[in-house]
Every structure is written in C-alpha cells, then in structure tokens.
Amino acid sequence: MKQGVNPNDHKKVQRIDSRLEVEARLADARRHEAEDLTFREMFEAWLADGVSREDGNAELRRAFERDVLPAIGDKPVRLVDDSDLRAALRRVGRDRGAGRTAQRMLSELRQLYRWSLSRKPWRTLVADGSPAELVEARQVVNDDYEDGIRDRVLSDAEIRELHEIQVRLRSTYESLPAGHRYGGVRPMKRENELAIWIMLATLCRAGETMKAEWKDVDLQKAEWFLPAANTKTKVPMLVFLSPFALRQFEELHLLTGHTPWCFPARPSGRVREGAQPPDRHVHEKSASKQVGDRQVRFMSREGSLDHRKHDDSLVLANGERGVWTLHDLRRTGGTLMQAMGVPLDVIDRCQNHKLPGPKVRRHYLHHDYANEKRAAWNRLGQHLATILSAAATSKQVARKGRSRGARTTTATGQVLAGAE
C-alpha cells in the first residue's frame, strides 16, 4: 500500500503473468512437438483420413512399410527432402528392378504431400512445398526401363505350351510317392489353373475373377454376372460363357461349389470337421503371385520368399518373349478376337471398357450387343479349344514316340512329360 499498489491486484497480476508464462511454455512445447512429427505419423494420418482404397489401404501400407518407412519413417517431416525420397525409390526401381512399382509409389508420395499441404499441422512442416514434386519419374528407374503400357500377347504356341506345362506338372507331381512330394515341383492350385483359362476365355480381369460368387454363375444358362461392385469400371456386366469357358466353371464347381465363392480363401490353421465354409474370396492377387513365383528369372529376388514357390516352371517359350502376367491374358483374348474379325466396339464391350464418345450417345443408344458378345465369346472359346486339342494330339504322338523310344517335342521345342 505504501507504493500505492493494491496487494490483491498485485496478486492477480502475478497469477495472470504466471498463467501466461505457463501457456507460452505449453505453446512452445506443442510447437516443438509438432516440429518433430515424423514422416510415419504423417503417413498414418493420410491412411486414416486422406485415402480410401477397396482393400482398406492394405497394399499401400504393405508397400510403404517395406520400401519407404524403414528409411525415413522416423525422420521428422520438416527434415525429409527430395533426396530422401529419391534414395528410397531408387532402391525399388533401380536396385530391385521394379521400375513400375517405383513410379507408382512416387505418384502415391505426391498424393500424400498434396494432402498434407492443406492440413494442419502438416502444412507448416512442408511450408517449402512437396519434396516429391522435385523427384522425376526417370530418376528412380534404370536407364533401360521402358515406360509404357505392357503389350505382351501370348501366341497360340505359348497358350498350347502353358496347357502342356500344367498337365505335365500335375501328372508328374501326383505320380510321386507321398513321401517324395515335398521335393517335387508343386503345380499351381487347380482352382488357379482354371482361373487362367476363365480369364483368357472371358477377357475378365484377375480381380473380377477372384471375387466371383457362385450365386452369380448360372451353369444351366451358361452366364456369369459381374456386379458393379466387382468391376473396375463400376459397371455391371453379363458374360455369356462359351462351351470352353463353361467347362472350366463346371470343373471349378466340383472343387469349390460347396462354398459361396468360386475362389474361396483358404482357412488358416487346421480345418475342423463340420466347420463353416470360407466367408471370403482369396486375395485378388493370389493367382497373379503364383504365376510370378514360377517365373523367378524375371524377378529381382535374392532368394525365395517364405511359403512361396521359387522356380521357372511357368516360363513360356524358353523366356525369349519375357514374363507373362494374368492381365496379359485379357489382352491376348482381345487380340485373338480382333484377329478373327470381331468388331472393335464388340471387343470393348466384352472387356467391359468404359466406352468413348459423348454422354448423349450413351444416354439414347441402348442396344445391349448381347448377340454380338455371345458370338464373340463363342468364337474365342472355339479357337482356344482348337489350340488345346492340338496339344492333346501332340501328347498322343509323344506316347507313340515313347513306345518306340523316340524323343518327342512340342511346337515350342519343349520335351513332353515322359519323353526320353
């Protein structure tokens, strides 16, 4: 009071000053904490709120956890620069030779940073802009990488050879005594072998095929309905099954018809008697991986993967035409239709492509091309049946040759099973 200051007011000022100091310290701590947020934390935030894919982002997470997060996951976002991203992607595109994967991941990194630039607290940590934009696609691949759409088409000889390989591997494996099968070359699951011919005969994508349910397959009418949710274009499709394609589905039904799914997921662990059938389909890439695992000469792997095949049993034409994939079957079937004179607009509809042209045309023109598509699928099926019947003929010749001690080969030069 001697200084003319009310003690109560003085205490209030001190309390206010103390509170302001605490708030300032807390704000400073929060600022420092935000500044130290890691790339992994930004990635997790993006997965939760910035991107949504059909598989629940599982493939996206798997790719980043394998190739990006081990290198920069624990690094503060503000310290991650283009050289960090470039180095991580080069390990994929150059060291591993997976150029397409590296370029896809670069695109995903750009998406991640575009999302972060407009959201707190990330935008303050990337105030200088997206480092992913400073990485060029050509910088993460080898010099001989050919950037473009695959154009691999299987020849008639390769289609025939593929069938012969399947038959030979299965026959050889099943003829082995039970105790010796572990060391033998195990064929693909029969379901996936059938999937190959279904995809080739119908032009359907691998993911669409793996999701098929028996309720959508009418074996009596020879029809397969693909709901919009299962197609890439989100447009439903009715496939008219050729006799060739129908035979594949009929055999498949003997294997999996007791489940809702044409390609059911394998139950984990030991299956108990009376257990419920699988309640989901196999992973969309299950068959694709099985095909790739059997062409390892084209894969940049240092060794075999756990519980995965690691051989060259499905390499075609001695590998001279490179790796083949399941998506190549779709291209092959379309090309065969084209060679047989099927109009391109009918092929587009058989492949369920999103059709070009003005919306008004699609709005007013409603012919469903059912007869044209049925005829196209039937012609393709007849051609495939002819190819495989030639394979069967070559087997008969091989058996006669073996009886005379002759050495018999296929049209592609491959020695048939049992030939001397």
Regions of interest found by a model, annotated:
Residues 23-96, 112-114, 139-143, 293:
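Basic/aromatic-enriched alpha-helical hairpins
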Residues 31-32, 164-174, 221, 255-259, ...:
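C-terminal secondary-structure termini that scaffold catalytic or DNA-interacting sites
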Residues 35, 39, 43, 56, ...:
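Hydrophobic (often cysteine-bearing) scaffold residues that line and stabilize catalytic clefts
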Residues 92-110, 118, 125-206, 210, ...:
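Basic, Lys/Arg- and aromatic-enriched nucleic-acid-binding interface segment
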